[in-house]
Every structure is written in structure tokens, then in C-alpha cells.
Amino acid sequence: MCIRDSLARVTAVNLYFNEIQKLIFSLSMWRCTPSFSARARAILEEADKNPDGDVYEMRKRRNYSDFWRSIPLEEPYRVILAEVRDKLYNTREALQEVISGKRHALDPADESVICAKEQLLEPLMACYDSLKEVGDMTVADGFLLDLIRQVHNFGMGLVKLDIRQESDRHADALDAVTKHIGLGSYAEWDEEKRTAFLVGELEGKRPLIANDLECSAEVREVLDTFRMIAHLQKVCPGSLGTYVISMATVASDVLAVVLLQRECGGDPAALLNVAPLFERLDDLRDGPAQLKRLFSVPWYHTHIKGKQEVMIGYSDSGKDAGRLAAAWALYEGQEMATHVGDEFGVKLTLFHGRGGTVGRGGGPSHLAIMSQPPSTINGRLRVTVQGEVIEQNFGEHENCFHTMDLYTAATLEHTLKPPDGPVDEWRDVMATMEKTSCARYREVVFQTPEFNPYFIQATPGQELGSLNIGSRPSKRKSNAGVVALRAIPWIFAWTQSRFHLPVWLGMAEAFQQMKDDGKMGTLRAMYQGWPFFKVTMDLIEMVLAKADPAVAAYYEKELVEPSLHAFGAQLRQALKATTDIVLEITEHPDLLTPQSDTGGQGTYTTLADKLAMRSLYITPLNVVQVENLKLLREIEDGNPRPDWVPTWDWAKEMLGRYESNDLYHAVVSDTLIITMKGIAAGMQNTG
């Protein structure tokens, strides 16, 4: 049992304990059903013959606020709830022993403690049903119902921890298994053969993974993770949420995880729900077909009981194809996936893997939800909240409730009054622009020889990977290049230099093609009448307002070799072209300056004012960052400045254990990190 889960459970127990105390005080009525009265009588009789001593003396020693003496049968709800209070107290004591190392985990067989939320819900529901049956509806629907809802939603651990792993790691594990038992290489099988094998194993009962399996450390890690999942599901039910498969591409990716869960000791009736994460453009397009293939497997269709979670990735799709192409692929993918779910009678919950920045799908919560395709939410929504915006949206009590209000209101509004969908002409326009923008984006990023060295030199992307920033490695694999780079440092690097290239690259060509084809009026109509397109354009406009070509040019001048300067000038020209045509479509006189209702004079929005004020502080940080990037690269090239020696006595004393060059490197790195954090704070959404 992990410390994180134990601490979360202690917090939950304390919350529920206080609520139970209040309910014991308020539920003083005597009217109840005969079965409920019999239950209360049995509890009192058991307490009277308790071999461990006087129950009421024990309650007195625990310093309960009230009702520690014997409760009469005429107060049956208090009798039941007092027993629940005792169990919550016992649970808290047991969890404290787990945290201190005196015991390994809670014992699910111990009836004196509460391990699963069902154990707490059962007596509460018994109270609720009894009150309803005898006509005390006002009491039943008061604090008691509030507590039932809290327990139902938050369980005994408050927050469930999702598990996430790449699909290739599961394939490697199964490859080791099939080779060990003499079936050949799972990695070399086609999708048909993989699916047939997995379904056959899932329908059968034979053990698949041998105890003496010889495998690599990577495979052992995957199998150990599944064994830990099985263990936690037994001793800490409700602690884990969904198993997310990143870089999912085919139906067998999901079946593989279900099989590995079972074969590593998981209870077939309590396996984690498995959510494929479709991230790249081609995977988003093919995702609905793979869901159809998955739901067509009778065993799996029965296993999921009409519910399936699907995660869609905004980050890697944007990095793979550009923001415009990714946005349209996500829109169409959600529509088609929902239709597949309806076809097979499966309620689909879409899990939106959004980042904090527009390049990774970020944006205002309410607008983002309302711009989703009609009939794709239906009262169910999951969304990631990035660490960089957690404090902003949930850091204070008022902000937290305001954010939850926005999510709830938007989800209900979208469900009860879905936004209008696009007409066929608008779909055709988007399909054409998707192809054009994607082709241009990929041409520049993946096919232009100058791009990779320019990116490495003109941004702090390379340095980000070596600094202790972020929760994940900057690259998925050790090989160099943009392809291996994760979406977060990809966006982060361009945001630091104020270029924001991943958001707008390829759009100018797509919009210009429509303009040349006489479709400017159509684009303006789309902006005025289609929530998806309007939100997309407004977010792009916001990012363009945050961009500063002069700052980007300064990074280039100071950090990039002269042979690449012409390429940088082309990119800045593309940024200007994007800005011009976006303003032409939105009919705004300037960025973040909508037309005034009177006289056509622009009025700056609050955001524009904030950006103008922040720029006074961010630009000096950019200058300092450039200087420290130069210094750090000199160190890495083996040419540190030899005359650098600290002159302050306190610095010499505190950092005296370092060699001079190590100290120099530490100071430069720390300064660089400070500039990164400062620019990130000014930009608000960075990675």
C-alpha cells in the first residue's frame, strides 16, 4: 500500500468522520422500517456481548464529541451511524500504522475497518431507504444525501490514480511471453493474428505467463506494474482509475492490456478500465475504425458492460500535423467515434488530453467544451488539467468553485442544447485547409534540412532536456530530432522565444488558398456561425498577440549561425502573413481588438492590456535568457569563461565544495531556469 494512497485515505476518513458526527446529531427520529430496526437491535445486542470489553468505554476513550454512551433502540439511525463512526476511527488508526510502517496494508477481511466505498455506502443507503419508506423525504434528501453523493464520487481515496504506458511496451511484454512458450514473435504478427491470439486467451482460462519467464528489465518493469495494479485492487479498492494506453493505434493494443491485467493476478471482475489514447493525426483518423473492430469482439463487448473511455491527444497531434489539421482531425474523430459507440450500444466517454497552451489544445474551459461536436459529450466528460494551470484554476477556494461551475455549466449546456454543426460546405472547406496546412507544416518541420538545427540553436529546447524541469523526460526515445521530442518541450521551447511556431505554422497557406478560390466570405461566415471555427480562430489570435517577432529575431541574431538567418526570416514572414490573413477573416482592426459597435474604433480587451503590461517584464527576461544560453553552450562546448570566480565571501563559503567550473555551470543553469519560469509566468500557458 503506497504512502500517497494512505495519506489520501486518511484525509477522506477525516472528512467522512466529521460528516457522520453531524448526521448522528441530526438523525434523532425513531420512525424506521422493521428491517432497519432489526439491524439496529442486532448491533446493540452484539455490543452488549462484545468479548473485547465495553464498547461504550472504548468510545469514551476516543474522545468522541457526543453519543459515546449507549444509544437506545428508539434512535435506530444513531445506532447504525455510531457503528459507522467506530469503523471510520478504526480505519484511520490502521492507516496511521500503514504510514508509520507498522503494518503493510489494510486487511480487506477485517470487518472493523472500511477498505472500499461500498462498505461505507451500504449503511448510508440503508438509512436513506428507511427514511424514504417512512415518509421522511426532507431529512433523507438533506445532509445524508449530500454525504452519499460525496462517498459515491470520491470514494475512500478522494482521487483515483490513472496508469499510463505506451502501447509498444505492452507489445514487447507479450513478445517475450509468446517466444518463451514457443509461439513465435508477437511483435512480428499482423493485427489479425494478434487479435485472434488475444481473444483466444481472454476466452480461455489457461495461465499464460510462466514463473520462469526470461525477459529484459523493460519487460519486467511492465509485468511488475501489472502485478502491483492487481495487488492494489485487492488491498486498496478504488485507488486506481483508468489504464491509459499512449500511442495507441489498433484494437489489439486494448486487448493486450486487458489480458496482461488478468495474467498478472488481476481479478477478472475488477480489472481497470482501459482507454486507448489516439494521439497522432493518422491514429485520430483511424481511431473510430479501431473502436468498431474492438466492439465487434463479443468477449470485449460483454466485458465493458456498455461503457468505454477513449482519450484523444491534442499535444502530439498538433506536433505531428500542426494546430489547424489536428483540430479538424479531433473534431471529426469525436463525431465518428460517438457514432460507433451508438451503433454498438456503448456509452462513450471522451477523455480530452489537453495541455495548457493552445498548441496542446488549451484554452478557456467553457469555450473549449461548447466548441465540441454536437452529441459527443452527453453529460460525460474527462479532461486533463496541466500542472501549470492547476494553481491558476484551482489554487484558491473561489477560483476552484468558479472553474467547476464553468465545467459543469458547459457540460450541461452542451448536452441539453448542443451547438449547431457545420454545413457541408464548411466541412469541405475545413477538409481542404487541413490537407494544405498539414502539408506545409510537415514540409517545414520534417522535410526542411535547416529546421532542426535552427530549432536547436534558436530556442532553449535542447537545454530544457538537461535541466530538472518538468515531470517527464523531454524525449520519448534517446535519438535526437523533433520526431523523438515530446510535445511539452516542443511547445515550451517556442513559447520561451516568443515565436509560438507550432500554433500558426501552415495556416497562412491554407487560408490564402481559400481566399484565392473566392472563399473569404465562407471563412467569415464560418467564424460568425460555427462555434468550433470561432473558438479555433480566437485562440490563434490570442497566441499571435503573444508572439513577438522582434524577440524571436533577437534569439536568432545572438544564438543562430548566420547561414540559417535567411531561413529564420522566412519563418517570421510566415508569422506576419498568418497575422494578416487571420485579421482579414475575423475582420478585426488589430489582434485582440474587435470592432467597436460605434464608429469602428478598436477597443483593447482586458487580455490585450495584460499582455502589454506583462511584455515590459518578459522582454528583459528574454534578453537575460539569451545571454545565459550563450554562456551555457560555451560551457558544453568546453570553452567556459576562465576568469569567472565568485567575489562574495558568503558565496565562496556556501559553494566552496564545487570546483570553479562546476560552480559556474550551476549559477548559469539556475539563472536560465529562473528566466524560463519568469517567461512561463508571463505567457501564462507554456507547455
Regions found by a protein language model. Give the residues of each.
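Conserved catalytic alpha/beta cores of large enzymes that bind or transform nucleotide phosphates
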Residues: 9-107, 310-318, 341, 346-348, ...
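Acidic, glycine-enriched catalytic cores built around paired aspartates
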Residues: 60-76, 80, 157, 162-164, ...
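Structured, charged N-terminal subsegments at the starts of enzyme catalytic cores
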Residues: 69-275, 279
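C-terminal structured domains
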Residues: 277, 289, 318-327, 333-343, ...
